[in-house]
Each structure stands twice: as structure tokens, then as C-alpha cells.
Amino acid sequence: MARTLSFQQAINEALDQEMTRDESVILMGEDVAGGQGAEGEMDAWGGVLGVTKGLYAKHGDRVMDTPISESAFVGAAIGAAASGLRPVVELMFNDFLGVCFDQIFNQAAKFRYMFGGKA
């Protein structure tokens, strides 16, 4: 019998399944771990929409809160991918994607050529 899931539940379940299956999958974003490990940590809400709720408890340090600098953590994810990890980045809202374009178009897109095909 088919299950009915909200988008939030489907994304959470897919992330959980893939992080369980593959240790190289990491998750980065603002408040995705609810400040876990920080002084005054709170119950992990799971990002602004609750999509990552419960993932820190299950996968620990592979779920990472980031500073409010989308370009920085997208750049970090690109570097992580170049080193063999499989990063998933949660941007709070699609409006913030534009500030990441430099990392995507001017950095990641040229890695192969900048590093002689070794990245």
C-alpha cells in the first residue's frame, strides 16, 4: 500500500536513509543541527522548516550547523565534494541561492581545468 508523505517528511526520510547507507554523506546548513554541541544548545528543530529534525541525534557530527554565510558553506560543500565526501546543503530559502553562484559557476565549474583534471 502506498504511503502519503509531506515534502518535509519525504526529504527527511531520504536524507536519513542515505546518511545511514553511506558514511560519506554530510549535511550542512543554518540550524540543521539545532546548535547541538554549542553552549546553550536547544532541542534540534531541524532547520527553519524542520526538514532535518532528528538527523543530528542519529548521525551526529555529520550534521553541521553553519554560520549565516551561504556562499561560505556552499564553497565548503564544493571543497568537501572535491575531496570525496557527498555533501548536502540546506539553504533556508531559494532567495539565498543567488549569493552562492560565484562558488558554483566560477569555482566548482572550473575545478577540472584549474587542477589539471585531478579534481
Spans of model-derived segments:
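Thiamine diphosphate
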Residues: M1-A119
